Amino acid sequence: SSTYFTFTTNQIFGADATSTTWITESIDLGGYMVLDTACQRSCCGEVWLKTHAKILERHGLRVKMIESSDQFQFGSGKPIAAAERAYIPIEMEGQETKGLLFGVSVLSTNIPFLASRTLLERLGCIIDMFTKTITFANLGVTLPLTHKHGHLAVNIAMFSEDLANHPCWKHLSRDQLWHEPDPELMFAPGAFNKGSIRDLPPQA
C-alpha cells in the first residue's frame, strides 16, 4: 500500500475551525523554499521547478531527476502522485559548507517548494518569531525571517562564486549514492557542522 503525505486540514487533524490557507504563486518563489511544518515530505510544482532550474543554470548548476512513487493529499482532495523527485543544489546566505542537495517530489500542481517538517528537523531548524530570525543549527546559519504571501520562506539560492566547480559535486555524482537515495536530503562529507547530525544515514 502507498503512503500518503497529507497537509493540515480540519477534516484530517480534527481542528475545530478551518485555518486560512494562502494561494501562493510559484512563479515568483523561484529560489525560495516555503517552511511547511505540516508537510511530511518535501514537494514542489512543475512550474516552480522550471523557474528554479533557470536560476541554477545561471550558476552552472543543475537539477538531478529520479523516478518517484510518492503520493500526496491536499486537504480532502484526491491523492496526487509524483512521477519524479528532483534533487536541487542549495546554498543559504552565510553558509560556509558546500554540497547540499534537497530532495523534492515534483507534482503537476502550481505550488512552490514546500519544505517538510522532516527536512527542517534534520537541518536543525529553529524559528524565532520574537526576534524574527531562523536558525539552521546544523549548517551554522542564522537568517532574518522572510515572508512571502503570508508564508515563512528562506532563500536557498545564495550561491557563492565558482560553487559549480567545488569538488563536493564530484562526490555527490557517485553512482552508489543513487541506488536508494535519501528522499529529503543528500550531502557531501563535511557539509554539516561536526557532530550536529544524529539521524542521517551515512553517505560515504
Regions found by a protein language model. Name each.
Residues 82-204:
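Aspartic protease core domain of the pepsin/retropepsin superfamily
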Residues 66-84:
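C-terminal reverse transcriptase regions that engage the nucleic-acid substrate
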Residues 20-67, 102-104, 108-116:
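Aspartyl protease active-site motif detector
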Residues 1-26, 204:
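Charged, flexible boundary elements
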Residues 15, 41, 65-67, 162, ...:
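Intrinsically disordered, low-complexity regions enriched in Ser/Pro/Gly/Gln/His and often acidic
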